[in-house]
Amino acid sequence: CVVTFEDELMELNKKYFTGRALDNRMGGFMIAEVVKRLSENKKKLDFGLYVVNSVQEEIGLRGAQMIAERISPDVAIVTDVTHDTNSPMYDKKKSGDIKAGSGPALTFGPAVQNNLLDLLIKTADKKKIKYQLMAASRFTGTDTDAFAYSNEGVASALISLPLKYMHTTVETVSYTHLRAHETSL
């Protein structure tokens, strides 16, 4: 006998969304919203833009590796989620102090190109978008790693949406974060 829960995306207090499998789906949703805004505003870009969503990030970045090899980008801005460390059982000394509702998290780390990160920070400051900074001492654990080390190296950056209760059926994200994330992109 197999028992499953019937679930759906729910809104909490008009501030948060909660549901299952928001990890990675939120990144895909955000980039889809960016494309929608570009289309609605009839925005013409001075460069080619590939908007992709990958598979198998949790088990080895396989989709991102294939995409990076196929399109050979000059720049990659990856959207994903990160742990809200204000949830129970997080050691902020190890994981940093990242909180849902306080802005998207921009990551420093070996896979992140400093000039691209500086551009994201300056853009957020100019547009008065709140953000948080986090560090990755080795791997980011996201598709950023696949892009950064592909081909001959790709300038990469990571914008993460803080998510409570990752890898559970009640993953929770801030609605205002989601909109700020889209605006920064």
Residue ranges and their predicted role:
Residues 59-132:
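Metal-dependent peptidase/peptidase-like ectodomains
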Residues 18-58:
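Alpha-helical metal-binding/catalytic segments enriched in His/Glu/Asp
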Residues 41-49, 128-137, 185:
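Flexible, glycine/charged-enriched surface loops at secondary-structure junctions
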Residues 9, 52-60, 81-83, 138, ...:
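Acidic, glycine-rich active-site loops and adjacent beta-strand->loop/helix elements
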Residues 138-158:
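Short glycine-rich, acidic/polar surface loops and turns
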Residues 1-29:
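Catalytic-core environment of secreted peptidases
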Residues 176-183:
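Conserved small/polar residues in nucleotide/adenosyl-binding loops
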